[in-house]
């Protein structure tokens, strides 16, 4: 009964709304204002208390903020510093050669892990930045779809009053309108959450309005290529886990060789060293396989994203052609306004998918650059981003 009353109330509000004869064109013209500011007064009312007003930020700035605010980076920095200090002290105290080698390996591995932590934070920033742009576009698209559904419902109600269609058709469109309205609410909520997450990750105040000054999609290059063998070599040199596995196997081998003389090592000690060598060799083999798989998967994903981008471009071109035909039909009176608006919205969504495909492609390129040891922040600087 409560649900039936709720639906009846909603339909009553719809009748009041359609009595005002809303214009779809006005709604569509206002949609760009929603891109990153949310749905207007409702967004401001929902904004956290004390939230700042406006933030303009580029991709490189966002990356710097993520790195500065990353707990993982701070932890890696501390570990790298402690490892370097432990090795320095061991050298000063003239520790045994194998002990020095172990400490040196730990220090070098910690430095590689620090670079990985910084790159991981940078990648998270890029994904969050692109994700915020995508959330804004999705909210804009949902508002446009709602405006189209609203106008279609208004027209269908008029046609029903004129006896041209049945009430079931109107009810179906009312359901479609309510679904579109729910999608708008969820999209606006996702947009607010994306903005809040971005600010929190950079450890800055929450902002009601965020202006993204970098067009991530424009950075994508579908002609980019990588050589599998070259990437594998570079990835091995950059991976802290692979480096640690290699050095551990080397040290285990040296210790095993050093204990082969029965005059200086007991049988149990030699057996333990042999077992340690086998374990180290197995870990190295697993690390090598894991790294090779990661490189292969990353490059396969890159190829897939390039193909997806090309497909989305073709789909957008087809949508453009369909819109041209729809405008001709509308000009000849063969199509209603809401039908033309629906075609326009379909074209906009097709181009939004192209933009998202480009952003996804660029993010994947940065993941590969990070994997092969490139500094993501430096890559962005070389791209001219500030």
Label each PLM-derived region with a short phrase.
Residues 26-37:
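Bacterial N-terminal signal peptides
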Residues 188-230, 366-386:
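Short, solvent-exposed, mixed-charge loop/turn linkers that connect secondary-structure elements
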Residues 3, 43-59, 113, 201, ...:
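Acidic, low-complexity, intrinsically disordered peripheral segments
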Residues 76, 83-103, 117, 137-184, ...:
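Charged, solvent-exposed structural "stalk/scaffold" segments
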């Amino acid at each position: 009964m409560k649900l039936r009353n709720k639906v009846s109330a909603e339909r009553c509000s719809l009748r009041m709304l359609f009595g005002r004869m809303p214009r779809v064109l006005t709604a569509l013209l206002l949609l760009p204002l929603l891109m990153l500011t949310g749905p207007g007064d409702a967004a401001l009312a929902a904004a956290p208390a004390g939230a700042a007003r406006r933030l303009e930020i580029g991709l490189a700035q966002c990356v710097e903020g993520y790195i500065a605010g990353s707990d993982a980076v701070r932890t890696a920095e501390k570990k790298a510093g402690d490892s370097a200090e432990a090795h320095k002290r061991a050298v000063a105290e003239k520790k045994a050669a194998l002990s020095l080698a172990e400490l040196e390996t730990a220090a070098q591995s910690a430095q590689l892990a620090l670079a990985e932590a910084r790159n991981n934070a940078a990648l998270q920033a890029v994904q969050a930045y692109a994700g915020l742009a995508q959330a804004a576009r999705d909210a804009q698209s949902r508002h446009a779809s709602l405006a189209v559904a609203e106008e279609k419902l208004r027209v269908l109600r008029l046609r029903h009053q004129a006896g041209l269609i049945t009430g079931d058709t109107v009810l179906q469109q009312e359901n479609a309108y309510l679904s579109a309205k729910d999608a708008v609410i969820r999209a606006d909520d996702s947009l607010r959450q994306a903005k809040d997450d971005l600010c929190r990750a950079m450890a800055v105040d929450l902002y009601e309005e965020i202006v993204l000054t970098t067009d991530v999609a424009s950075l994508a290059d579908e002609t980019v290529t990588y050589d599998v063998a070259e990437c594998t070599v570079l990835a091995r040199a950059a991976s802290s886990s692979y480096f640690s596995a290699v050095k551990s196997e080397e040290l285990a081998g040296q210790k095993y060789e050093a204990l082969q003389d029965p005059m200086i090592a007991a049988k149990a000690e030699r057996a333990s060293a042999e077992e340690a060598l086998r374990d180290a060799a197995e870990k190295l083999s697993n690390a090598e396989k894991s790294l090779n798989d990661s490189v292969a998967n990353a490059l396969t994903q890159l190829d897939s994203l390039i193909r997806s981008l090309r497909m989305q471009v073709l789909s957008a071109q087809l949508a453009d052609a369909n819109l041209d035909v729809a405008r001709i039909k509308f000009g000849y009176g063969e199509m209603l306004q809401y039908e033309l608006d629906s075609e326009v919205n379909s074209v906009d969504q097709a181009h939004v998918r192209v933009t998202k495909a480009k952003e996804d492609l660029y993010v994947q390129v940065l993941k590969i650059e990070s994997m092969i040891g490139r500094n993501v922040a430096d890559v962005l600087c070389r791209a001219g981003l500030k």
